[in-house]
Curated annotation (Swiss-Prot):
Belongs to the urocanase family. Catalyzes the conversion of urocanate to 4-imidazolone-5-propionate. It comes from Xanthomonas axonopodis pv. citri (strain 306). Its main location: cytoplasm. NAD(+) binds at residues 51-52, 129, 175-177, 195, 262-266, 272-273, 321, 491. It holds the Pfam family Urocanase. It comes from the Bacteria. It catalyses: 4-imidazolone-5-propanoate = trans-urocanate + H2O. This is Urocanate hydratase.
C-alpha cells in the first residue's frame, strides 16, 4: 500500500479527445484526476484533497486500478468503489450510474476515530470527506458562495445589512477554510484568518483567496484597522496558532465584529495543531504518538472554545462553521460549548427549506470561456434574481479557477433541472466546447444527516435521523445520476454525519436530457421533502407550490 508518492503529478485531461469509451466514463476519470491536481488538492502526493485526510483514492495502487477500470467500462457497466478502492464491475443498464461509491461507512457502534484509524492503518478504509472521495471537489470555490451567503446573512441580522468597516476573525486556511477570506471581502468585511501551515497560506495567496499575510499579530491588526477605517475590505492571513491568537486578543481587549472557525477540528489527530507545538513536531507525532496528539489537541480545542464563548458573551456574533469544534470541546469538559449556534440553523436553513444549495458545474473542455457562457445562461434563465446575478458577477471577477474551470451557484428546486437541460442543449449545439458535469456538495438540503451541522436543532428533533441521505442516494441512483456516493463522517468526523453526493454529465444527448430532468428535480426535492417532514412551513409551502407528491407529509 503506497500512500505517499512524491513523483506523481496528476492533472485532468482537457479538450475532446477521450481516454475512456464515452463521456459518461471520461467525466468521472477527469474529475478524479482533477481532485488531485496540484492547484486543487492540499497534499496531492498523499492523495489528500482537503479536510485533514480526505482522500480521492485509498492508495496509489487503488488510484491506478480505478483509472484502468474507468477506461474500459462499457455503456452498461457500473464500477463499485469501496472506501477508495475499486472492488467490482457489474453489468447494469445505460441509465444506471457508471460509478457507485461508498466511503468511510461503519456500523454505528464502531463509528469512531479509533476504530476508523485502525482500519485506515491496515489499508482497509479511506476517509472520503464529502467531495474528496466522491470526485467533485473544485477547490475553495466549492464552499465560497455558501460562506459568502452566511456572512451576508450575519451582516443582515447583526449590522443592518452593512459590513463595511467590520472585520471577521477566523482560523483555518485549508481546502474549506481557505474560502473564508474571499467570502468575507465579497460580503464587504475585512478578514483576519489564522493558519498554522505556511503552505496553506501560500496556496490561498496563489489562487487569489487571500490578499496578504504576515507572521506578526501586531502587523495583522494594523492592516485590519487600516482597512476598516478606509472601509476597503482586506483579507490577511496570520501564520500562527488560532487558540493562542484568540487568547491574546482577549488579553488586549480587542474584539472582532464577527467570529467563527474552520480549522479541521473534526479530526483531533490530523486536523488541529495543539498549542505550544510546532508543525514539525505535530507532523511527526501524528504518526508516532497519535494518542498524545489527540489529547493535546482536545485540550487546545477546549481553550479555543472558551475564548469564543467569552467573545460571544461580550456580544460578538459568534458561529460554529461546521467543523465540530464545539463537540470536541464539550468532550474535553466545556459544558456550555454549544452556547453559540451553528451556521445552518442560524443563517442557512430557510434556503434548504426551498431546496436551495450548492449547485456546481465543471467544464470538461478545460476552457474558461465555457464557464463564462454558462454564467450568462444562468442569468438568462433566472432573470429576476439580482442577488444571484451579483454573485455571478463577483465570482467571474474575483474567483480564480483551480484545475478544471468550474462554478458554484446556489439555486434550488425548479431551477436546477432547467439549468441542466440548458447546459446540455449548449453542448449539443456546439456552443460549449465539450460536456460539463453538474454536481453539488454533500452539504445540501436533503443529502445529509449531521446533528452538529446541517441538521442541528431541527424543529421536530430529528437531527440524527439518517434515513434521508440514504433515500437521497437511492433516488439519485434510480433517477440516473452518472455517479452517486454515500459517505460517513464528512465535515464533522467519525460518528457524527452520514451524507450522499451525486454528479451527472451533460453530454449533449437526448438520453442525457431525460436523466438531467429526473435527477436535477428529484435531488433538491428530497431536501424540500425532508424539511417539510420536520415541520418547516417554508418547506411545506414550497412543496405545495411545486406540486410534490408527499403522501405522509402533505395531508
Amino acid at each position: 500500500m503506497t500512500r505517499h508518492d512524491a513523483t506523481r503529478v496528476i492533472r485532468a485531461a482537457t479538450g475532446t479527445t477521450l481516454t475512456a469509451k464515452s463521456w459518461l466514463t471520461e467525466a468521472p476519470l477527469r474529475m478524479l484526476m482533477n481532485n488531485l491536481d496540484p492547484d486543487v488538492a492540499e497534499r496531492p502526493q498523499e492523495l489528500v484533497v482537503y479536510g485533514g485526510i480526505g482522500r480521492a483514492a485509498r492508495d496509489w495502487e487503488s488510484f491506478d486500478a480505478i483509472v484502468a477500470a474507468l477506461t474500459r467500462l462499457d455503456e452498461d457497466h457500473t464500477l463499485l468503489v469501496q472506501s477508495g478502492k475499486p472492488v467490482g464491475v457489474f453489468r447494469t443498464h445505460a441509465d444506471a450510474p457508471r460509478v457507485l461509491i461508498a466511503n468511510s461507512n461503519l456500523v454505528p457502534r464502531w463509528a469512531n476515530w479509533d476504530h476508523f484509524n485502525e482500519l485506515d492503518q491496515k489499508g482497509l478504509a479511506m476517509y472520503g470527506q464529502m467531495t474528496a472521495g466522491s470526485w467533485i471537489y473544485i477547490g475553495a470555490q466549492g464552499i465560497v458562495q455558501g460562506t459568502y451567503e452566511t456572512f451576508v446573512e450575519m451582516g443582515r441580522q447583526h449590522y443592518d445589512g452593512n459590513l463595511a468597516g467590520k472585520w471577521l476573525f477566523t482560523g483555518g486556511l485549508g481546502g474549506m477554510g481557505g474560502a473564508q477570506p474571499l467570502a468575507a471581502v465579497m460580503a464587504g468585511a475585512s478578514c483576519l484568518a489564522v493558519e498554522c501551515r505556511r503552505s496553506s497560506i501560500d496556496m490561498r495567496l496563489r489562487t487569489g483567496y487571500l490578499d496578504t499575510w504576515t507572521d506578526s499579530l501586531d502587523e495583522a491588526l494594523r492592516l485590519i484597522e487600516e482597512s476598516c477605517t478606509a472601509r476597503k475590505p482586506l483579507s490577511v492571513g496570520l501564520l500562527g496558532n488560532v487558540a493562542d491568537v484568540l487568547d491574546e486578543l482577549l488579553l488586549r481587549g480587542i474584539r472582532p465584529d464577527l467570529l467563527t472557525d474552520q480549522t479541521s477540528a473534526h479530526d483531533p489527530v490530523n486536523g488541529y495543531l495543539p498549542q505550544g507545538w510546532s508543525v514539525e513536531e505535530w507532523d511527526a507525532k501524528r504518526v508516532s504518538a497519535p494518542k498524545e496528539v489527540e489529547a493535546a489537541a482536545r485540550d487546545s480545542m477546549a481553550n479555543h472554545i472558551r475564548a469564543m464563548l467569552t467573545f460571544h458573551a461580550l456580544g460578538v456574533p459568534t458561529v460554529d462553521y461546521g467543523n465540530n469544534l464545539r463537540q470536541m470541546a464539550l468532550e474535553a469538559g466545556v459544558d456550555n460549548a454549544f452556547d453559540f449556534p451553528g451556521f445552518v440553523p442560524a443563517y442557512i436553513r430557510p434556503l434548504f427549506c426551498r431546496g436551495i444549495g450548492p449547485f456546481r458545474w465543471v467544464a470538461l473542455s478545460g476552457d474558461p470561456d465555457d464557464i463564462a457562457k454558462t454564467d450568462a445562461k444562468v442569468k438568462e434563465l433566472i432573470p429576476d434574481d439580482a442577488h444571484l446575478h451579483r454573485w455571478l458577477d463577483m465570482a467571474a471577477d474575483k474567483i480564480a479557477f483551480q484545475g478544471l474551470p468550474a462554478r458554484i451557484c446556489w439555486v434550488g428546486l425548479g431551477d436546477r433541472h432547467r439549468l441542466g437541460l440548458a447546459f446540455n442543449a449548449m453542448v449539443r449545439s456546439g456552443e460549449l466546447k465539450a460536456p460539463v458535469v453538474i454536481g453539488r456538495d454533500h452539504l445540501d438540503s436533503g443529502s445529509v444527516a449531521s446533528p452538529n451541522r446541517e441538521t442541528e436543532a431541527m424543529a421536530d428533533g430529528s437531527d440524527a435521523v439518517s434515513d434521508w441521505p440514504l433515500l437521497n442516494a437511492l433516488l439519485n441512483t434510480a433517477s440516473g445520476a452518472t455517479w452517486v456516493s454515500l459517505h460517513h463522517g464528512g465535515g464533522v468526523g467519525m460518528g457524527f454525519s452520514q451524507h450522499a453526493g451525486m454528479v451527472i454529465v451533460c453530454d449533449g444527448s437526448e438520453a442525457a436530457d431525460k436523466r438531467l430532468e429526473r435527477v436535477l428535480w428529484n435531488d433538491p426535492a428530497t431536501g424540500v421533502m425532508r424539511h417539510a417532514d420536520a415541520g418547516y412551513a417554508i418547506a411545506t409551502d414550497c412543496a405545495k407550490a411545486k406540486g410534490l407528491d408527499l403522501p405522509g407529509i402533505l395531508r
